[in-house]
């Protein structure tokens, strides 16, 4: 019973870590990063399709991203979707590929992004703590109902605390790395 609860909590915490990674990839750093466009949807023959399924990405230098559509007829729609995306880049279409030159981030913008990273990190840490709370409640109920002994419940709680601490520290480390990346000029 305790092991299943711990395993379930760990799976939930691991999903939170993955969500944190995805959130941090979508934060712009001034470098060309294909991950910025992972959530861009393109109107392709009447249905919205993720950009990653319609084109390949290449970085030609630190600030230039080259997007090559698999189907040339989708070029205009891809350009339109990129222009309307929240990333804030200006795509240029040369008829075969789309080039995006990432503008240099201002110091003020970098600070805003650092705040955003901190806030996202805090949201994800709360999610980890909520998973811990749910698991602890399940363990306490099992002990109270007599399904497991108090010693086993206490041992499970210690493991749960270690698991929570490890995941929170991982989120902190990811946030610190992203902040350093943002503040690097």
Swiss-Prot record:
Top-level taxon in the UniProt lineage: Bacteria
Start and end residues of each stretch annotated as Disordered: 138-160
Matching InterPro entries: Ribosome_recyc_fac, Ribosome_recyc_fac_dom, RRF_sf
Keywords: Cytoplasm, Protein biosynthesis
GO CC entries: cytoplasm
Subcellular location(s) of the protein: Cytoplasm
GO biological process, one term: translational termination
Transmembrane segments: none
GO molecular function, one term: ribosomal large subunit binding
Family, per entry: Belongs to the RRF family.
PANTHER family reported in the protein's UniProt record: MITOCHONDRIAL RIBOSOME RECYCLING FACTOR PSEUDO 1, RIBOSOME RECYCLING FACTOR
Job description of the protein: Responsible for the release of ribosomes from messenger RNA at the termination of protein biosynthesis. May increase the efficiency of translation by recycling ribosomes from one round of translation to another.
Protein name per its UniProtKB record: Ribosome-recycling factor
């Amino acid at each position: 019973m305790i092991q299943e609860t711990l395993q379930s909590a760990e799976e939930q915490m691991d999903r939170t870590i993955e969500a944190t990674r995805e959130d941090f990839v979508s934060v712009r750093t001034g470098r060309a990063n294909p991950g910025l466009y992972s959530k861009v949807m393109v109107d392709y023959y009447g249905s919205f399709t993720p950009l990653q399924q319609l084109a390949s990405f290449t970085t030609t230098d630190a600030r230039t991203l080259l997007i090559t559509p698999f189907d040339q007829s989708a070029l205009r729609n891809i350009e339109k979707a990129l222009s309307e995306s929240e990333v804030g880049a200006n795509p240029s279409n040369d008829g075969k590929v789309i080039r995006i030159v990432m503008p240099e981030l201002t110091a003020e913008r970098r600070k805003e992004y650092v705040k955003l990273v901190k806030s996202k990190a805090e949201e994800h840490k709360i999610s980890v703590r909520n998973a811990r709370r749910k698991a602890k409640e399940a363990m306490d109920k099992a002990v109270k109902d007599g399904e497991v002994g108090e010693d086993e419940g206490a041992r499970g709680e210690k493991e749960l605390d270690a698991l929570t601490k490890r995941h929170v520290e991982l989120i902190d480390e990811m946030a610190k790395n992203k902040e350093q990346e943002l503040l690097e000029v």
